[in-house]
């Protein structure tokens, strides 16, 4: 008996929950919650599957399972941090399920959601439910990032999906930071200017809360640099 069946036997309806995009520099974090009645062949950790197989399994899961998807925006990531934004996306995924699970299996550790459950480290390799959720979250997010490429063709979001690849970092250096970048993340904050941040705000591309938060981070960063430079040269701080 697999791990999913053990929990189903004890709790009844069990959902697997996973996310995609937690470590990216751009775009949202996407979570999926999946309830499977019957096992689907080939489900595994989404990162170990080819893009073509992920797409095929995504369609099969969407057709045969109860699926909920939740998104936390770059703004929510900046304002609440990536851990809390990930929990927000996961809870939204659970809210969007058409059935109400009594227990959840969550990939990761230390994550408490609105439904009782347990966390499994590398859960997408141990649980078919979490594996299915990982596939749904990744394919949904990959498609979303491909749409961002159409909006911002100077960025290869259809390829690197917003991860901190060498190509993506070079694109930021060349073209500048976008509103969909996670401005609280290094190295995005390092490459963001005060003028560009204010331009985003004045054009209505970011909220006042986000503007003030990132402005404070930029000012704090300048203060740290100032202190380091003075200390390195044995100069008084004030």
UniProtKB/Swiss-Prot annotation:
Catalytically driven reaction(s): Endonucleolytic cleavage to 5'-phosphomonoester
GO-annotated molecular function: manganese ion binding; RNA binding; RNA-DNA hybrid ribonuclease activity
Classification via InterPro entries: RNase_HII (IPR022898), RNase_HII/HIII (IPR001352), RNase_HII/HIII_dom (IPR024567), RNaseH-like_sf (IPR012337), RNaseH_sf (IPR036397)
This protein's record includes keyword Manganese: yes
UniProt keyword annotations, A-Z: Cytoplasm, Endonuclease, Hydrolase, Manganese, Metal-binding, Nuclease
Cofactor: Mn(2+); Mg(2+)
Free-text cofactor note: Manganese or magnesium. Binds 1 divalent metal ion per monomer in the absence of substrate. May bind a second metal ion after substrate binding.
Residues at which a divalent metal cation binds: 18-19, 107
Compartments, as annotated in UniProt: Cytoplasm
CDD domains reported for this sequence: RNase_HII_bacteria_HII_like (cd07182)
EC number annotated for this UniProt entry: 3.1.26.4
One GO process term, biological-process aspect: DNA replication, removal of RNA primer
Domain RNase H type-2: start-end pairs: 12-197
Function: Endonuclease that specifically degrades the RNA of RNA-DNA hybrids.
Family note: Belongs to the RNase HII family.
Name listed for the protein in its UniProt record: Ribonuclease HII
